[in-house]
Design a protein with these regions (language model features):
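His-Asp phosphorelay/catalytic-motif detector in bacterial-type signaling
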Residues: 21, 66, 82, 90-96
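Conserved phosphotransfer microenvironments
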Residues: 72-90
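Hydrophobic/aromatic residues positioned on beta-strands within the core alpha/beta folds
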Residues: 99-100
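Acidic, metal-coordinating helix/loop segments flanking the phosphotransfer/catalytic sites
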Residues: 51-69, 77
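Non-catalytic signal-transmission and effector/linker regions of two-component phosphorelay proteins
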Residues: 1-23, 56, 115, 122-138
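Conserved acidic carboxylate
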Residues: 28
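As written
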Residues: 110-117
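Two-component/phosphorelay signaling modules centered on CheY-like receiver
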Residues: 31-50
Length: 138
């Protein structure tokens, strides 16, 4: 019978600067998921504010710094949704990408055209969607 040690594991992610210069607001109510996404973003060179578990915590972070992009969980604890925060970010010109554990929820019309990534999100997905948003340095 094979043991767990017999299975090949993927090598740990190496630090890179693929997203260097990109500031990201991360809103995720699961501490474990939030920390995992934050670590991956930082390994890719992004500067991360959060993870914020509530929209109030996210708004507090926005008072300190306007990000280049926001990664948001739509359904937060206690029935809280992030659509009000999404509207606020869009008014300020901040692109929004949703992270969802399920595509089984009805999508409000206010989210039309919004990129939705299913969790767990991969390094390749983050690079594909965040890379083009990286500030240009001349």
């Amino acid at each position: 019978m094979p043991s767990a040690s017999d299975h090949t594991r993927a090598p740990p992610a190496k630090s890179s600067d693929d997203l260097a210069g990109l500031s990201v607001l991360l809103v995720e109510d699961s501490a474990a998921v939030g920390e995992a996404v934050k670590q991956l973003l930082e390994l890719l060179g992004a500067s991360v504010s959060g993870p914020a578990a509530t929209t109030a915590a996210a708004e507090s972070l926005l008072d300190q710094r306007l990000p280049d992009v926001a990664l948001l969980d739509f359904h937060l604890r206690g029935g809280e949704r992030s659509d009000g925060l999404i509207a606020q970010l869009r008014q300020q010109g901040v692109p929004v990408i949703l992270l969802s554990g399920s595509f089984e929820f009805p999508t409000p019309s206010s989210l039309a055209g919004t990129t939705i990534l299913e969790k767990p999100v991969s390094e390749a997905q983050l690079l594909a969607h965040l890379g083009p948003l990286k500030p240009r340095r001349w």
